[in-house]
Amino acid sequence: MARYIGPKCKLSRREGTDLQLKSGVKPFDVKTKKHAKAPGQHGQARGKQSEYSLQLREKQKVRRMYGVLERQFSNYYKEAARVKGATGENLLKLLESRLDNVVYRMGFGSTRAEARQLVSHRSITLNGRRVNIASIQVKAGDVIAVHEGAKQQLRIKNAIELAAQRGIPAWMDVDHSKLEGTFKAAPDRSDLPAEINESLIVELYSK
């Protein structure tokens, strides 16, 4: 399945929640005020959804939020089910530990898509080495930094300003003056987005 390159707000409207695909300069309700309904000819008609439909929508919502393709998401679920612990929580931890997401959470990218681009352009270092694979799983103690040659990029400076408003997660130590941060540990479920109902995803894959 190809990566979606259309209007980002359209995806958020489809899921009925802010997927954090835009920078956050404007609140979600302001950005979508003109198109408050779900996209499509019958967007306003949100009838009662079946159990399967709710499960599928939740999976699509999370997949789009983290910018992960269908096959990648399926592989993450298999890994989450294989290791010890609650499968749904394990899945979210794997997604949150992706390098592109960590770069975003640390405030070096204004969106996950921008953070992914920074990684692919080799503007990010992991433990002192330049990397270009957005899906790398960051481990506790890993140090992520902006490469010296990219430190003057205006988009990174803008992202840091936005991060100051958004806040930095407790499971990271970030020094924006040095443009580097340390991933202290994988987050607890209480630290993760409350609007995600991972149990629906587990139910979907358990069929």
Swiss-Prot record:
Belongs to the universal ribosomal protein uS4 family. One of its GO terms (molecular function) is rRNA binding. One of the primary rRNA binding proteins, it binds directly to 16S rRNA where it nucleates assembly of the body of the 30S subunit. This is Small ribosomal subunit protein uS4. One of its GO terms (biological process) is translation. The keyword Magnesium does not apply. Pfam families: Ribosomal_S4, S4. Residues 26-53 are annotated as: Disordered. PROSITE patterns: RIBOSOMAL_S4, S4. Part of the 30S ribosomal subunit. Contacts protein S5. The interaction surface between S4 and S5 is involved in control of translational fidelity.
